């Protein structure tokens, strides 16, 4: 049956071909028939054949990859250790050869002389390329000089292997015992051995220098120019403040209103101050100040300059300070000497004036505010003797006006006084938010006027700890709240 069907199909195709050739059928139908015959004549791959061919390619690629990996692993595991073992055994055999230390020393001296001095004709003796290689005889034929020059160049390019500790000790003994020991040779050896070494001390020094440079730049607040001179007849230290340059800007306008306070420490009673120069970063003062002091006492005294920025509506800003001591080490002193000093950056907190401890207690029903001055510590010395006579003055302030003031007793000749004295103010509850306390530690002076050692404030208008202490007192009425307060300079 299939054979008869194929025969019928073949006859039908022939019949259609004859009809197309005679033109009995349409041209388009004949073209479609011809294209159909061509498509049937092309060999077609079945889907199972395509999948089998792709699977064969994938399996072949995986096999090649596994073969490459196995070759690489076998090379790493077998070939590299075998080669290193062969090299190590060869070098070990070479190191076991006997060394002629006398010849080595002689040849080393010849090499050093040849390296430092101009080239000389080649000797007839043998030349050593290294400590472990045998002697190579040199030919003495007519072209010997050219061969020698070439050999010398080759010798200089060869790196000498590192000698053992025993070799170094024996060679050192030979060098010391040799009467012709050359210092230049030893220096050259040290230079050659030092090439390529890392010296941590050089990097450490450089880093320290860089740190010092950054530190000095970060603390620089300009420079102060002044003149010092001592008048032996009047026994006075003459200080002339000439000018300041490159001061930092403290105002929003990009300028400052600078002035300078001067002390001859440890005496803070004698204080001088320059005029305020408005809106400038390079003020010219040209003011002279006198400090009566004995010449022999200058060694224990320090000249202290404090540069401030004047502010009409708030506390003055401390720009920086300059401290001059060891007057006898200054050039041309006691004659006139001109000095330029960097103004060191300090904050108000860095000015160590001491601390004061007191407690606050408020009774709302009675309208009574009690401040108990307990003690102070590490106060700044205001007298030449290195001590002070401190007492505490408390002022009740409202809108910048002083309503009342009280003070404690004076403690003589101490920097750590203990008071335990209570001061009471009558303040009604409706006015407690409008007032604040100003506390000043004073130094009593029997002859002159009393000096302020330092001040602090508590209240809603105070800063940081002063405001926190006041808020804590109001939060816990009828309970004494004690804190230490750092003293600040009075503005």
UniProtKB/Swiss-Prot annotation:
Phosphoserine carried by residues: 177
Protein localization: Cytoplasmic vesicle, Secretory vesicle, Synaptic vesicle membrane
Main location: membrane
List of residues binding Ca(2+) 1: 251, 257, 309-311
Compositionally biased residues, Polar residues: 91-104, 127-144
Comp. bias (Acidic residues): 105-116
Endpoints of the signal sequence: none
Cross-referenced CDD domains: C2B_Synaptotagmin-3-5-6-9-10
GO cellular component, one term: hippocampal mossy fiber to CA3 synapse
Annotated region (Cysteine motif), positions in chain: 9-31
Cofactor: Ca(2+)
Positions annotated to bind Ca(2+) 2: 251, 309, 311, 317
Gene Ontology biological-process entries: calcium-dependent activation of synaptic vesicle fusion; regulation of calcium ion-dependent exocytosis
Topology class, membrane: Single-pass membrane protein
One Pfam family named in its UniProt record: C2
Residues in C2 domain copies: 220-341, 352-485
List of residues binding Ca(2+) 3: 311, 314, 317
Residue intervals on the Cytoplasmic side: 74-491
Region Disordered, annotated ranges: 91-147
Family: Belongs to the synaptotagmin family.
Comment text on domains: The cysteine motif mediates homo- or heterodimer formation via formation of disulfide bonds.
Record's subunit section: Homodimer; disulfide-linked via the cysteine motif. Can also form heterodimers with SYT3, SYT6, SYT7 and SYT10. Interacts with DNAJC5 and SNAP25, but not with HSC70. The interaction with DNAJC5 is stimulated tenfold in presence of calcium while the interaction with SNAP25 is inhibited.
Functional summary from the UniProt entry: May be involved in Ca(2+)-dependent exocytosis of secretory vesicles through Ca(2+) and phospholipid binding to the C2 domain or may serve as Ca(2+) sensors in the process of vesicular trafficking and exocytosis.
Protein name (record): Synaptotagmin-9
């Amino acid at each position: 049956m299939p054979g008869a069907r194929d025969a019928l199909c073949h006859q039908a195709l022939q019949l259609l071909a004859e009809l197309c050739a005679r033109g009995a059928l349409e041209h388009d139908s004949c073209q479609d028939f011809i294209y159909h015959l061509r498509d049937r004549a092309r060999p077609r791959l079945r889907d199972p054949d395509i999948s089998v061919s792709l699977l064969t390619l994938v399996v072949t690629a995986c096999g090649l990859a596994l073969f490459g990996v196995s070759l690489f692993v076998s090379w790493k595991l077998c070939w590299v250790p075998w080669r290193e073992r062969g090299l190590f055994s060869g070098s070990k055999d070479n190191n076991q050869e006997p060394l002629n230390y006398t010849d080595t020393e002689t040849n080393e001296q010849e090499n050093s002389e040849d390296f430092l001095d101009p080239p000389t004709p080649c000797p007839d003796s043998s030349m050593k390329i290294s400590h472990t290689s045998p002697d190579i005889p040199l030919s003495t034929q007519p072209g010997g000089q050219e061969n020698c020059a070439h050999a010398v160049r080759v010798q200089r390019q060869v790196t000498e292997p590192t000698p053992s500790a025993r070799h170094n000790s024996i060679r050192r003994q030979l060098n010391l015992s040799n009467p012709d020991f050359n210092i230049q040779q030893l220096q050259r050896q040290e230079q050659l051995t030092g090439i390529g070494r890392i010296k941590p001390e050089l990097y450490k020094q450089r880093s320290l220098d860089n740190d010092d440079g950054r530190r000095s730049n970060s603390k620089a607040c300009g420079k102060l120019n002044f003149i010092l001179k001592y008048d032996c007849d009047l026994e006075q230290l003459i200080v002339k403040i000439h000018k300041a340059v490159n001061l930092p800007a403290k105002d929003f306008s990009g300028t400052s209103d600078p002035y300078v306070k001067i002390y001859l420490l440890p005496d803070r009673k004698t204080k001088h101050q320059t005029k305020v120069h408005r809106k400038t970063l390079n003020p010219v003062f040209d003011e002279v100040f006198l400090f009566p002091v004995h010449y022999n006492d200058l060694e224990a005294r320090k000249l202290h300059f404090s540069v401030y920025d004047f502010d009409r509506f708030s506390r003055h800003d401390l720009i920086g300070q300059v401290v001059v001591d060891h007057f006898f080490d200054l050039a041309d002193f006691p004659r006139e000497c001109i000095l330029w000093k960097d103004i060191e950056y300090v904050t108000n907190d860095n000015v160590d004036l001491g601390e004061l401890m007191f407690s606050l207690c408020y009774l709302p029903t009675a309208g009574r505010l009690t401040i108990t001055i307990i003690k102070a510590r590490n106060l700044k010395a205001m007298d030449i003797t290195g001590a002070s006579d401190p007492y505490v003055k408390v002022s009740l302030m409202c809108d910048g006006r002083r309503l009342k003031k009280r003070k404690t007793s004076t403690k003589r000749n101490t920097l750590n006084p203990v008071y335990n004295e209570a001061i009471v103010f009558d303040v009604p509850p409706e006015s407690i938010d409008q007032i604040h306390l100003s506390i000043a530690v004073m130094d009593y002076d029997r002859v002159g006027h009393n000096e302020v050692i330092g001040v602090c404030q508590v209240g809603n208008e105070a800063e940081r700890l002063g405001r926190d202490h006041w808020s804590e007192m109001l939060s816990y009425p009828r309970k004494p709240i004690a804190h230490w307060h750092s003293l600040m300079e009075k503005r």
